[in-house]
Amino acid sequence: MISAAIVGGTGYTGIELIRLLSAHPKVSIDLLTSRSEAGTRADEIFPSLRGISDIVFSDLGDETLATLQQCDVVFFATPHGVAMKQAEALTQAGVKVIDLAADFRLQSLSEFEHWYQQMHTCPDLLKTAVYGLPEVNRAKIAEALVVGNPGCYPTTAILGLKPIIEAQNKQSKQLIESRIVIDAKSGVSGAGRQASLALNYAESTDNFKAYSVEGHRHLPEIEQGVAQLLDSQFKHRIRFLPHLVPMIRGMLSSIHMELTDAGALVDWQQVFEQSYASEQFIDVMPKGLYPDTRSVRASNRLRIAVHQDNERAELTVIVVQDNLVKGAAGQAVQNMNVMFGLDESLGLNFAPIVP
């Protein structure tokens, strides 16, 4: 059995990790930490875990840190800035690290410090950390000691653009114009479990709003992901605008592009179907069908629809996922499976919840 620890088990992604790993046939959760709930059983705080896990929360003290070094893998479901303080000692002990925060997502130290407004305490490890999007970096993840789990918005954006960028790489002519617009909507769980006036029921229900209009910290992550895929001379300008919608979990991103004359000759439906034919967690919808967020609820699946309008020279890609699963905890488990040479679907092969 793989000995796993979860640091920060009281947030929504932490709860999802407990749920997923408790059902994983090759994993044992041997340590669960929380500064605020140390000494309390997890199923006392979250009744949904009754009969699933009775593990007791530990404080993140010196004794716990020593125990972490005895595990095979440590998941950090913590605020930004926590994993970087522990990762070096853990990797030196041979422990694999999967960070669900942003400490190891951005390769650029200056970009991280600009967008997250804190100094990175482990810059050397940042250079070797792998961006944990299996559909893009599977081979590198398999060899990684540290994986930076992607943000929820970048997961939809990068996977929604990947077939287009790869098709562009094979062409001498530009297929889409330089400007890409990503219009994204997330359920309120994406903002976390902490108390917030903006997330109060009376504030967020029956309401729909844009936020971080002047610039969201997931933008450089999206730009980095596109740049890593792109090996042609064509560059793109990305406009990313997130919105908060009155639902608990779920995410929908609409990606809008303008086709060139050469791009209008491409059958983009076929391109997407061929690109993701072997990916078990990505479902390309048949032409004319479009996914909704409920169709992926509580699952690790991501559904994509493609609409090509040659008359208006427009290409629209619609992507949906559960922001807490494929957008967070499920993807972390998928990364763990890759890191340990397991089938990627292990512990994740379950149907979405409907209704």
Swiss-Prot record:
Pathway: Amino-acid biosynthesis; L-arginine biosynthesis; N(2)-acetyl-L-ornithine from L-glutamate: step 3/4. One of its GO terms (molecular function) is NAD binding. It holds the Pfam family Semialdhyde_dhC_1. The active site is at C152. It catalyses: N-acetyl-L-glutamate 5-semialdehyde + phosphate + NADP(+) = N-acetyl-L-glutamyl 5-phosphate + NADPH + H(+). One of its GO terms (cellular component) is cytoplasm. It comes from the Bacteria. One of its GO terms (biological process) is L-arginine biosynthetic process. Transmembrane segments: none annotated. Keywords: Amino-acid biosynthesis, Arginine biosynthesis, Cytoplasm, NADP, Oxidoreductase. Belongs to the NAGSA dehydrogenase family. Type 1 subfamily. NCBIfam families: argC. Catalyzes the NADPH-dependent reduction of N-acetyl-5-glutamyl phosphate to yield N-acetyl-L-glutamate 5-semialdehyde. This is N-acetyl-gamma-glutamyl-phosphate reductase. The gene is argC.
